[in-house]
Each structure stands twice: as structure tokens, then as C-alpha cells.
Swiss-Prot record:
It comes from the Bacteria. It is an enzyme of class 2 (transferase). Keywords: Acyltransferase, Cytoplasm, Iron, Metal-binding, Transferase, tRNA processing. One of its GO terms (biological process) is tRNA threonylcarbamoyladenosine modification. Substrate binds at L134, V135, S136, G137, G138, D167, G180, N276. This is tRNA N6-adenosine threonylcarbamoyltransferase. Binds 1 Fe(2+) ion per subunit. Required for the formation of a threonylcarbamoyl group on adenosine at position 37 (t(6)A37) in tRNAs that read codons beginning with adenine. Is involved in the transfer of the threonylcarbamoyl moiety of threonylcarbamoyl-AMP (TC-AMP) to the N6 group of A37, together with TsaE and TsaB. TsaD likely plays a direct catalytic role in this reaction. It comes from Pseudomonas savastanoi pv. phaseolicola (strain 1448A / Race 6) (Pseudomonas syringae pv. phaseolicola (strain 1448A / Race 6)). Belongs to the KAE1 / TsaD family.
Length: 341
């Protein structure tokens, strides 16, 4: 089965072709980072308009790269949520229109299920069951995964997601959007031990997260330094390092706790923050001590992309899941509501 995948949940337009027998044939991505940087964050209306502009050229590019034509495609998978409604509608309407014109099925895919399954595109994919850490700008969740659509939420953030905390902390220190990579870059030049921030909710049982207070601690420290006349680049780097260390250690502690609670030895990390090298190193060390394994996607598939949507859609389509050609998207959508395969 050859599936065309379309991703338009936020500020990346992603298109890919995945074949159930040959694997990933082609993928293309256009990032809107430069478009939104001047505003310090994503402007939904601008995002939607740019998706309209980029979608069809990217589809043509992907078909050409895979040496395929429209009649080769068996089905279309598109992101139906969660995400920005206007952006989602661009991908959904395009998918349904093409499906109608080509007389093939179209299936809406859960954005975070796409992220969760992205490591399965790698040469050494994880095997069920496993614990997944979904960590992005909008989500921080620990999930037990027993199969596709068989998800048990173990814990999630009570306020800011980890990626959101990275972005907001970077913004308040005058760094460019997107803030996560800027924090990581600055942290490489930081001096360890100058600042120490709390590891929120690690001193109590449970698998919930909270990053709002950590973000506030970083803000207060930065403002105190500014008040003392020290707003140097080195101070910014030192705060970035302390902040990143706090987030990484918090996530690692909670992941270790989840693995022990479930008795599992395999951990998948997915979502934009899973590309963070410090987080990967910390989790690899922790899993090494537990004699377990950690899995993640290649860096370009950690952020939003069409390949993960094509793959996730292919799994569900092959299992017989079907939808009509009505256009329906969801800004909020619990992954536990998905049907199991």
C-alpha cells in the first residue's frame, strides 16, 4: 500500500510517500520559522496561508522524488489534530479533495500518534510494549504503549509543556524563536553550577510534570542579574545550562519511575524536544543502568513531518480503518480515544 502523508498541524508543511513494502520513498518539508520569527511565535493566520501556498508544490516534489504518479497512490493520510484549526483544515481539505478526485480513501491521523510511531521508521524499531515520553511544544506525557491505539496515559504536565517552557524561557532572555534550539546552543557555552534550578515534582510520588515554576525561577534569576547590571551573554548561557539541566533531569527521573512502575525496559522518546542531545544522553545513560533500550527518530523526524503521518496512516489503513470524505479536525484530541488495532 502506497500512502501519501500530509502534515499541517502548526508551522511546518510536510509531505511524504510511504510504501508498506518498500518503506519511506520520499519526504519533503517546508518550515515557516523565518516567517514567524519576527513575531516571536507562530501566527495562526499566517501559518494557514503559507500551508495553502506550499502544499501542492510539495506534493509534486515528493511524487517526482519517488518517481511516482498520482495513480500509484492507494490512500492519503493527513493530520486531523491536535493543532491549529486553520492549519489543520488546509491539510484536511487538500487530502479529502485529492481522495475524492483520485477515488481513494483518506484517513485523519492523530498528530502525537504520528510522533510516537516515528521511531519505527528507523532500522532498529522498538517492539511493543514500551513506555513513551511524548515531549514537544504542546505536550509532555508518559504513555504505556501495548500496540497501535493501545495507549494508557501514565502522567502528563499540569501546566506548561517542556517545549513550551524552553521557548518561553528563551524569549524572556531575548533569544530568537524557536527558543528550544537557542537554549540548547547557549547551554553548550554555560558554566555548570553557577545557577541551580528546582527539579519540579520529583520529590513526590507520581508521574505528573510541572514546568511553570521552573520557568518562573529562570525568569527571576535573569531579572535579578539584569538588576545587578549583569545581562552578559555568559550569564544568559549559564542560565540556559541550568534550565536545560533541570528539565532533562526532571524528565529522566520521571521516565525511570515510569519504567519501574510498568516493569518495562524499553523507552521511546518522541516529539520536538526528543532531538535535544542532552536529553538523549541522559536517557541513554539511565537505560544503560537499567539494562534497557531507548529509541528515538532521526533528528529531522523529531519535529513535525509528513513521514510520520504517512507511516501512522498506513498502519491504520492496512488494519481496515476507514472514514468518509467529510472534513473534520480537532484542536484538542486525546490519544487514548483512538481505536486500538
Amino acid at each position: 500500500m502506497l500512502v501519501l502523508g500530509l502534515e499541517t498541524s502548526c508551522d511546518e508543511t510536510g509531505v511524504a510517500l510511504y510504501d508498506s513494502e518498500r518503506g519511506l520513498l520520499a519526504d519533503a518539508l517546508f518550515s515557516q520559522i523565518d516567517l514567524h520569527r519576527a513575531y516571536g511565535g507562530v501566527v495562526p493566520e499566517l501559518a494557514s496561508r503559507d500551508h495553502v501556498k506550499r502544499m501542492l508544490p510539495l506534493i509534486r516534489q515528493t511524487l517526482a522524488e519517488a518517481d511516482c504518479v498520482a495513480t500509484d497512490i492507494d490512500a492519503i493520510a493527513y493530520t486531523a489534530g491536535p493543532g491549529l484549526v486553520g492549519a489543520l483544515l488546509v491539510g484536511a481539505s487538500c487530502a479529502q479533495a485529492l481522495a475524492f478526485a483520485w477515488d481513494i480513501p483518506a484517513l485523519g491521523v492523530h498528530h502525537m500518534e504520528g510522533h510516537l510511531l516515528a521511531p519505527m521508521l528507523e532500522e532498529n524499531p522498538p517492539q511493543f510494549p514500551f513506555v513513551a515520553l511524548l515531549v514537544s511544544g504542546g505536550h509532555t506525557q508518559l504513555v504505556r504503549v501495548d500496540g497501535i491505539g493501545q495507549y494508557e496515559l501514565l502522567g502528563e504536565t499540569l501546566d506548561d509543556a517542556a517545549g513550551e517552557a524552553f521557548d518561553k524561557t528563551a524569549k524572556m532572555m531575548g533569544m530568537q524563536y524557536p527558543g528550544g534550539p537557542e537554549i540548547s546552543k547557549a547551554a553548550m557555552q554555560g558554566v555548570a553550577g553557577r545557577f541551580v534550578f528546582p527539579r519540579p515534582m520529583t520529590d513526590r510520588p507520581g508521574l505528573e510534570f510541572s514546568f511553570s515554576g521552573l520557568k518562573t525561577s529562570a525568569l527571576n534569576t535573569w531579572q535579578q542579574c539584569q538588576g545587578a547590571g549583569d545581562d552578559s551573554e555568559q550569564t544568559r548561557c549559564d542560565i540556559a545550562l541550568a534550565f536545560q539541566q533541570a528539565v532533562v533531569e526532571t524528565l529522566t527521573i520521571k521516565c525511570k519511575r515510569a519504567l519501574k512502575q510498568t516493569g518495562l525496559k524499553s523507552l521511546v522518546i518522541a516529539g520536538g524536544v526528543s532531538a535535544n542531545k542532552a536529553l538523549r544522553a541522559s536517557l541513554e545513560s539511565m537505560l544503560g543502568d537499567l539494562r534497557g533500550n531507548v529509541y528515538y527518530a532521526r533528528p529531522e523526524f523529531c519535529t513535525d513531518n509528513g513521514a510520520m503521518i504517512a507511516f501512522a496512516g498506513c498502519q491504520r489503513l492496512q488494519a481496515g480503518q476507514k472514514e468518509d470524505l467529510s472534513i473534520s479536525v480537532q484542536a484538542r484530541w486525546l490519544m487514548e480515544q483512538l481505536p486500538g488495532l
